[in-house]
């Protein structure tokens, strides 16, 4: 399942996964009804990542084993509503991490962002382990998410994978 499937990355990821795994095996899920029509070639679920019980029921009942969690409030919008950004970005992640901890999900893919860095991070040849002082709500939530993913891996063996995306420019 790709949660947050209607966004820029989600749309392309769903199409690539359906090509690789088959249309019927990849569920596109999002809160919005106005997803790109190209996602209609396979299963679609209207899903609010903040509805913990609905997400849990869907994943367990459908036997979903891999989750790509892309649902998030991005930088500009997050700055306007920090409390909601934190809730959306963290509670959604906790829901999925807990499902994996409980044995319902085998793999989680959760993107982080270059936003975890800040003005004090070296700009050239940035090492993997370096100063991270994010200066945005989005960056703060992504940095916290990285730590939570690490915690769930170290303490519960949760298979969670992440990359830090650079700044992406919308294609629309």
What are these regions (language model features)?
Residues 44, 85-86, 100, 108:
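A hydrophobic alpha-helix adjacent to the NAD(P)-binding/active-site core of NAD(P)-dependent oxidoreductases
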Residues 49-88:
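NAD(P)H-binding glycine-rich loop region in Rossmannoid oxidoreductase-like domains
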Residues 94-137:
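Conserved Rossmann-fold NAD(P)-dependent oxidoreductase catalytic core, especially the SDR/UDP-sugar
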Residues 137, 141-144:
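Active-site helix of classical SDR
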Residues 1-20:
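N-terminal Rossmann NAD(P)H-binding glycine-rich loop of SDR-like oxidoreductase domains
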Residues 22-35:
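Conserved glycine-rich Rossmann-like NAD(P)H-binding loop of the short-chain dehydrogenase/reductase
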Residues 40-51:
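Rossmann-fold cofactor-recognition segment
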Residues 113, 146-171:
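Conserved beta-loop-beta element that borders a ligand/cofactor-binding pocket
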